[in-house]
Amino acid sequence: MVSESTEAPTPAPGSVREHWNELAEDVRQHQFRYYVRDAPIISDGEFDALLGELNDLENQYPDLRTPDSPTQLVGGGFATDFASADHLERMLSLDNVFATDELRTWISRVEQETGPDLHYLCEVKIDGVALNLVYENGRLVRAATRGDGRTGEEVTLNARTIDDIPEKLTGTDKYPIPALLEVRGEVFFRLEDFAALNAALVEEGKAPFANPRNSAAGSLRQKNPAVTARRRLGMICHGLGRSEGFEPASQYDAYTALAAWGLPVSTHTVRVTGADAVVDRVQYWGEHRHDVEHEIDGLVVKVDETSLQRRLGSTSRAPRWAIAYKYPPEEATTKLLDIRVNVGRTGRVTPFAYMEPVTVAGSTVSLATLHNGSEVKRKGVLIGDTVVLRKAGDVIPEVLGPVVDARTGDEYEFVMPANCPECDTPLAPAKEGDADIRCPNQQYCPAQLRERVFHVAGRGAFDIEVLGYEAATSLLEAKAIGDEGDLFSLTEDDLLKTTLFRTKAGGLSANGRRLLDNLDSAKDKPLWRVLVALSIRHVGPTAARALAGEFGSLDRIRESSVEELAAVDGVGGTIAAAVAEWFGVDWHRQIVDKWSAAGVRMEDERDESIPRNLEGLSIVVTGSLETFSRDQAKEAILVRGGKAAGSVSKKTAFVVAGESPGSKHDKAVELGVPVLDEDGFRRLLEGGPDAVTDSGV
C-alpha cells in the first residue's frame, strides 16, 4: 500500500467548515427522507454527487470527518419503529463504479496489493432490502435489517414467514453446522409475485406499490407478521458476518456451504479470473438484466479468497475487496401534467413534477423533484410537455428535459408561487443570491410545524417511538398540540381528540398509551438530544455533544456569548452564531420553557463517581467494539472530560481499534499514536493515560 504523508493535516478554514456543515445537513436530510420516510426528493445521481463533494472536503481536511458524518454511516444512521438489534459484525455498504475503466482501475489497485490473476466472484446486485440472520447451533435466533450497519431493526417473526429462510439448518458430513453463523442477504420481490400483489391490491380498491424494492421494505417491516407472510417475499444470501466453527477458504466455498445447509444463494454467481473476464460479466448482465426473476441494479465483484479479503480490509463504510458496478439508468417518456410545490422543515419550497404514471426500471413513477425554480428553467420544461424521465441508479426518478418536437402549442410555463401554498406567507430567498426560496413563517407554517414535530422524534433527537409523520400530522390537525413545545404536556384527553390514537369505542388506543409512555421516558434523555430536537440550524449530534459537555445545562448555553460558544472544540463561529440567533427568538425560548415546565431535563447530572481522567485528551474510536456501541464509547470518553474525535492527527492521544478498524488504525501507527484494543480502552476509562502506558494491539 502507498504510505500516507506524515505531515499534520491542515485544519479546515472557517468558510470551508461552514460549507461542510451545510452540505452535511443536506445529505443527512436526504438520507432521512430516503431511509426513514421512503420519500426521497432527489435522484440517486444527485445524492451521490452531494456525498462525493462531502467526501472530497473530508479527504482534503480530515478534521471535518467525524464518526457521525454522513460519509461514515451506512444507511444514514436512522432507526424506525422496531426494537434495536446489534449486529455481531458490522454490515458494510459497497463502493460504486459506473464505468468499466473505473472497474479496471479498482482491479489494478487490488492486484497491486495482492498479486495478479486473482479469482473474483461476479454476483448480480439485487435491488432489495438487506437482512442479517443469526443462527445458533443451526437454529434461527434473530433477523435484523441493516440499519446503520451496527444496529438494525429486529424483524425475526417477519423473517420466519419467508419461505426461503430456513428455521433450522441441515448439516452434512462435509459441512457440519457451525455453533454460530451470521449470514447476510437481500430480501426482495420476484417480479411475478410483485405483479400479483399489485393486481390484488387494485382489485381490493387499494393503491398499488410503486416498485418492488419499496414494497419489500414495507412488507418486511409490517407489525403483523401475517401480512408479511401473505406477501411472498424472497431472499438470497450474499455474505457472512461472525461465525464459530466455520472458516471457509473462499467466498465461493462459503456459498457452497450455505447452499448445503439449506440457505438460498444465487444461481447467477460466477467465479472468474482477471479483469477481462470480470468486464465480460458486467457486459453480459447489462444486456440480460431483465432476464432475471427479480430486479437488479448492478453487478457486485468480490475478491474470492478469504485470506486476501482480510489482507485488503475495509474502510469505515465499505470493504476494499468488493465493488459494485452500477448500470446506467434507464429512461422513459411521459406527460408532465403539472408542477406543484412542497414546503420542507427549513421552509425551503421545492417544485416537483406531477406526471402520467409510467413504468421505468420496473417501477411505476408519477412524481419527480425539480429542485428549485432555476432548475425548472434550466431544464426548459413546460407544463403539458412530454418529458424524458430517468431512473438514476434505478431508484430515484429524475426529469431530464422536454421532448421539444412533441409540443403542440398548448404547453405553458411554470411560475414559482409568490406565497407559501400552506400558509400564504410571501416567499423569498433566505439571503441574496440563493437559488432556493423559503417560507419565512417558521413558527406557524403548517408544513414546517409538521416537519419540526416529526424531527423531535428522530433517532438523533429524543428517539420517540410511535411519533411518526402521520402522528405528527394528526396531533397538529386535531389541535392536540399547537407546536413542538406542547408535546411533553400531552394528556390522554389531548390524544382522544385525534382519530389516530382513539379506538372505535372512544377510548385511548394502545399506540396512544405507548406514545404517552415514550414521551415520559424521553424527558430524562441527555442534554445533547434536547439540543438536537430544538431544530437549531447546523446543530447535529456532534456539535450538540460538544456544547452539552462544555456547559452542562441549557441555561448556561442560552446565556453564553457567541465568543464563548465558538471557543468550544467542535463548534466554531457558524454554529455558535446559529445557536445565539436561535435563542434570541421569543417563541424558540417558549418551546424550551414549555419542555422544562413539563419535566424535560435541561441539564446533565454529573456522576461524581466517574473520574475526569481524560480531560483534554483527543481519542478516536474506530472499528467494531464488542461491549460498546459507537454512541456508548463516545459517551464514556466525553463524561470523563475527553474529546471523541473523528480523525487521527498528531494531536490524537489514543486510537481505540475494534474489529475492521480501517485506515484510522494505519494512520495512528504511521504517526506513532498509541493504539488500544478494547481491554486497553477499558483500562483507559478506569485509570486514565497512566493505566495504559504499555498497552496496545
Swiss-Prot record:
* Class of enzymatic activity (EC top level): ligase
Q: Where is the BRCT domain?
A: 609-697
Q: Which organism is it from?
A: Rhodococcus opacus (strain B4)
**Active site, renumbered:** K125 (n6-amp-lysine intermediate)
- Tell me which residues bind NAD(+): D44, G45, E46, F47, D48, S93, L94, E123, R146, E186, K302, K326
Instruction: Write the record's keywords in alphabetical order, separated by commas.
Output: DNA damage, DNA repair, DNA replication, Ligase, Magnesium, Manganese, Metal-binding, NAD, Zinc
The lineage is:
Bacteria, Bacillati, Actinomycetota, Actinomycetes, Mycobacteriales
Name of the featured protein: DNA ligase
Residues the record lists as binding Zn(2+): C420, C423, C439, C445
